[in-house]
Amino acid sequence: MNQGRIWTVVNPGVGLPLLLGSVTVIAILVHYAVLSNTTWFPKYWNGATVAAPAAAPAPAAPAAKK
């Protein structure tokens, strides 16, 4: 472990809950920011279907040669 000596300064009984709690808070804040600043994400989570774009009309067939 690269930073293994941190546990000589901070008790793991305190440090691990602080670390995991801060990760949880950051994840909740990111999800809140995405939900409050986009219109498509809440619809995606609710399962709303997106209306398919209208199909373009087919081009007319060329005139037959005689």
Swiss-Prot record:
A bacteriochlorophyll binds at H31. Gene3D superfamilies: Light-harvesting complex. It comes from Rhodopseudomonas palustris (strain ATCC BAA-98 / CGA009). GO terms for biological process: photosynthesis, light reaction. It comes from the Bacteria. The keyword Magnesium applies. GO terms for molecular function: bacteriochlorophyll binding; electron transporter, transferring electrons within the cyclic electron transport pathway of photosynthesis activity; metal ion binding. Keywords: Antenna complex, Bacteriochlorophyll, Cell inner membrane, Cell membrane, Chlorophyll, Chromophore, Light-harvesting polypeptide, Magnesium, Membrane, Metal-binding, Transmembrane, Transmembrane helix. Residues 1-11 are cytoplasmic. Antenna complexes are light-harvesting systems, which transfer the excitation energy to the reaction centers. Pfam families: LHC. This is Light-harvesting protein B-800-850 alpha chain B. The chain crosses the membrane at residues 12-35. One of its GO terms (cellular component) is plasma membrane.
